[in-house]
């Protein structure tokens, strides 16, 4: 399910990542609200669980309605890779969708993303306020990891 941003040796720009987000948002908008949630739940069912030893407070995303953990870093080629786990399907599916959009993308491009760049996904309006806060915290942590590793 992960679609890498790099094809061959082609460098991916920030605009290309934003286009991927827009395209995924357009695809999701074809689904009605309940069907979008069902899609997120289906994604979550295919996420491999993180080992217990990385489910620490340091890796937990604060502000979520449920427990969400994110680990990540830059690979040798300076592209980012993230893995998530959560104890609720909607949270897990949402986080997996977000990380799939940035996995394999250049570190500097991921570091330049903002919460507003993800608005075209159209997910925020499906989430409770607390889950929206968690989504913002997840995106900020993704960017922070890209800025530090």
Q: Which functions belong to the PLM regions below?
A:
Residues 23-24, 94-97:
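A general alpha-helix detector
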Residues 36, 90-94, 106, 114, ...:
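Amphipathic alpha-helical interface surfaces
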Residues 14-67, 74-77, 116-149:
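N-terminal intrinsically disordered, cationic/polar leader segments
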Residues 16-19, 89-93:
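Short acidic alpha-helix initiation/capping motifs at coil-to-helix transition points
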Residues 58-64, 82-86, 108-113:
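Solvent-exposed interaction patches of small proteins and small membrane subunits
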Residues 104-121:
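Glycine-rich phosphate/pyrophosphate-binding loops
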Residues 1-15:
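N-terminal amphipathic/basic-hydrophobic helices that include classical n-h-c signal peptides
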